[in-house]
C-alpha cells in the first residue's frame, strides 16, 4: 500500500511520466570528454548557479576543487578540508559537506569558514532542500538522516536500504531518492512539510552486472523534469519519474568506476561524473535541477 501511495504521489506532481529512452537525453557526436585529471579518487560533485563545477579528492585531496565554467581550468578553491565525500551548495550560498574523514556534517562559507552541524556520524553523501532541510546517508548503519532547517537531527529511516549511498531530491522537493550500494534498488520517500520522510519504498530497480547480486549504486542527481541519474557498476542508469529505467549511459572506461554525478556548465546541460582519478563530462539534451535559480 505504501508503494502504491508513493506512486500516486509521484504521478500527481507537476511532471507526468512518459516512456523515454536514451535518445531523449544523448546528443549524437557528443561523447565523454575529460575535464580534469591527476587526482587519486574524485567525488562530491556539485555546482553553483553560474554552472561552475566543484569536487573533492577523497583520498589525497586538500579540499574543494573548482572547474571554472568560463575557462575550463581547475583550481583548488578551498584548502585544508581533506576527506569530503558529499558536497552541495545550500540555499544560503554555503557548501554543505559530508566530512567523512572527521565523521561530521559541516557547512562551509565561500571564504572557508566552517560550522559544525553534527558529529559522530559515518556520513557518505547529502542533499539540501530549498527549505534548508539536509538529508544524508550513513552507509555502515544502513540509515538515512535528516537535519532540519532548525538544526534538529533525526534518523529518518534505518535498516531498510542496503548500504545507502547516493542521494537526491525531486524538482518539486516532495520526493527523496537514495541508491543502494549493497542492493539493486533506488529507494524513494515522500517528503512531508516538516521535512520528515514517509511511505518509503524500493521504487526504482537498477540493472545488475552479469553474475552479480548488487548494482553498486552510488552517486545520484536529478534533471529539471524529474528524471534520476544514478551511477552504478554498469554506468549511469537513468530513470523516469515513474521509476522506469530509460537506459544506461556507458562509462568512459568500461573497466573504470564512476561514483558521483552532477549537471553543470553555463546552461546546466553538461553531465559530469567522478571516475577515479579523472572527471569527465558530456553535453546532454536535458538540464540539471541543482544550481537552478
Where are these regions (language model features)?
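Short loop/turn segments immediately following beta-strands, especially the blade-tip
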Residues: 189-196, 284-290
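A short loop-to-beta-strand structural motif that recurs across blades of beta-propeller domains
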Residues: 63-65, 104-106, 143-145, 185-187, ...
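A short beta-strand motif characteristic of beta-propeller blades
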Residues: 31-36, 73-78, 113-118, 152-158, ...
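Blade/loop signatures of beta-propeller domains
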Residues: 18-31, 291-292
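Beta-rich, blade/repeat-based domains predominating
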Residues: 37-50, 80-99, 103-104, 119-136, ...
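Blade-level signature of beta-propeller repeat domains, shared across WD40, Kelch, NHL, RCC1
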Residues: 260-293
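Beta-propeller domains
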Residues: 55-75
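Short loop/turn segments immediately following the C-termini of beta-strands
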Residues: 58-59, 100, 139, 181, ...
Amino acid at each position: 500500500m505504501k508503494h502504491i501511495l508513493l506512486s500516486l504521489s509521484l504521478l500527481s506532481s507537476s511532471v507526468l511520466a512518459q516512456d523515454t529512452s536514451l535518445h531523449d537525453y544523448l546528443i549524437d557526436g557528443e561523447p565523454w570528454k575529460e575535464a580534469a585529471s591527476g587526482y587519486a579518487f574524485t567525488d562530491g560533485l556539485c555546482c553553483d548557479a553560474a554552472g561552475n563545477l566543484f569536487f573533492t579528492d577523497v583520498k589525497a585531496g586538500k579540499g574543494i576543487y573548482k572547474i571554472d565554467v568560463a575557462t575550463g581550468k581547475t583550481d583548488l578553491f578551498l584548502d585544508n578540508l581533506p576527506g569530503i565525500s558529499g558536497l552541495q551548495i545550500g540555499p544560503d550560498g554555503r557548501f554543505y559537506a559530508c566530512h567523512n574523514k572527521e565523521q561530521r556534517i559541516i557547512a562551509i562559507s565561500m571564504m572557508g569558514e566552517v560550522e559544525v552541524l553534527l558529529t559522530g556520524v559515518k556520513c557518505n553523501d547529502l542533499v539540501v532542500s530549498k527549505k534548508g532541510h539536509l538529508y544524508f546517508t550513513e552507509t555502515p548503519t544502513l540509515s538515512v538522516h535528516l537535519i532540519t532547517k532548525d538544526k534538529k537531527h533525526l534518523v529518518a529511516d534505518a535498516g531498510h536500504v542496503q548500504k545507502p549511498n547516493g542521494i537526491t531530491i525531486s524538482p518539486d522537493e516532495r520526493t527523496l531518492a537514495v541508491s543502494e550500494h549493497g542492493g539493486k534498488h533506488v529507494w524513494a520517500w515522500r517528503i512531508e512539510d516538516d521535512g520528515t520522510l514517509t511511505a518509503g519504498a524500493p521504487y526504482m530497480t537498477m540493472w545488475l552486472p552479469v553474475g552479480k547480486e548488487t548494482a553498486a549504486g552510488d552517486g545520484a542527481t536529478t534533471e529539471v523534469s524529474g528524471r534520476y541519474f544514478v551511477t552504478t557498476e554498469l554506468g549511469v542508469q537513468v530513470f523516469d519519474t515513474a521509476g522506469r529505467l530509460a537506459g544506461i549511459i556507458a562509462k568512459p572506461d568500461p573497466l573504470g568506476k564512476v561514483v558521483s554525478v552532477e549537471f553543470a556548465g553555463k546552461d546546466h546541460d553538461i553531465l559530469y561524473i567522478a571516475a577515479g582519478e579523472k572527471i569527465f563530462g558530456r553535453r546532454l539534451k536535458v538540464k540539471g535541477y541543482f544550481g537552478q535559480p
